[in-house]
A protein has these predicted regions:
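Tandem CBS (Cystathionine beta-synthase) repeat/Bateman regulatory domains
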Residues: 1-322
Length: 322
């Protein structure tokens, strides 16, 4: 990866892509999992002999295409199960266009290349969302101080509060509140397993239900949560056998819960820097939904931008295949 240069405002480079973990196609899935665990990453880029992007491999791929399919991680190479020739953004791509694409296509990760097709890094939409929220919170704090100062002047001099300031502060406040967790409810119950369920069976259920997390129950009560990232870090990287290892050994116990009226931004803030997902409860103490870091910014993103190119493909002007 080349040294970073000053990022033009409004571009993908300004989003500060993270350094990409890179591996070769002939690496076994077991070896890749160990590397991902050592680096605490859930996504790697696969590069060819010229160090150009040949594919992308994620924790979800390992859970769905390897463990969930009953394939042994030590017997299969990354090349056999990676997503080949992934869509990539260029460093000078519009940041808005790149994020819109990630939301529209359901990508959590998007590789970034420079004008010479060398790897510049990788975008993680959850990190982008956290960064945007921090900027919005700083803007709100500054605007609120100005609002309070003007309110003090109004009290002393009897003047009315400038409508522009009132409108600006209110607009930022509304953006920060955003949609609630209830808005992402699908009406479908969360996927559950027992403490005795094997990792292989849990991964197969994830694949079947198109989810990256399952709730673990013991005698009718939720006792833990198990995710695709756990499959990588706690099972395959540790050399455990998914067919004989029960989820109770490798789950995250006592997951956090949140009410359905919590805002998506608040939920993301609650999960920031933590490996667990959050389960939400309805008014009758019923588990309504389990969701991870990715679907939340996706849902919030849909609230902010519903643009679509009309044909479901990205404009070649700003995105390209590796």
């Amino acid at each position: 990866m080349r040294p970073s240069k000053k990022a033009p405002p409004g571009t993908v480079l300004a989003l500060k892509p993270s350094p990409a973990l890179q591996i070769k196609p002939n690496t076994t899935v077991a070896e890749a999992a160990q590397l991902m665990a050592a680096k605490r990453e859930d996504c790697v880029l696969v590069t060819d002999d010229d160090d150009r992007i040949a594919g992308i491999f994620t924790a979800k791929d390992l859970a769905f295409r390897v463990v969930g399919a009953g394939v042994k991680a030590r017997d299969v190479t990354i090349e056999e199960i990676m997503t080949k020739n992934p869509l990539c953004a260029k460093t000078d791509t519009s940041a808005t266009d790149a994020l819109d694409l990630m939301v529209r296509k359901g990508f959590r990760h998007l590789p970034v290349m420079d004008e010479n097709h060398d790897i510049s890094g990788i975008l993680d939409i959850t990190k982008c969302f956290y960064d945007a929220m921090e900027k919005l919170e700083r803007a709100y704090s500054s605007s609120r101080k100005l609002y309070d100062a003007l309110e003090g002047v109004q009290a002393e001099m009897g003047s009315s509060q400038p409508q522009q300031i009132i409108s600006y502060v209110e607009a930022i406040r509304q953006k920060m509140s955003g949609p609630t967790l209830e808005s992402v409810l699908t009406g479908l119950p969360p996927v559950t397993v027992s403490v005795r369920t094997s990792v292989k069976e849990a991964a197969a259920l994830m694949k079947e239900n198109h989810t990256t997390a399952v709730l673990v129950q013991d005698q009718g009560s939720i006792t833990g949560i198990f995710t695709s990232k756990d499959v990588v870090l706690r099972v395959i990287a540790a050399g455990l056998d998914p067919a004989t290892c029960s989820v109770v050994r490798v789950m995250t116990p006592h997951p956090d819960f949140a009410p359905m009226d919590m805002s998506i931004q608040s939920a993301l803030r609650k999960m920031h820097g933590r490996p667990t997902f959050v389960a939400w409860w309805g008014d009758n103490a019923e588990c309504m939904l389990t969701i991870g870091r990715w679907p939340l910014p996706e849902s919030a993103g849909h609230e902010r931008s519903r643009r679509d190119c009309g044909h479901g493909r990205c404009p070649e002007a700003y995105l390209c295949h590796a």
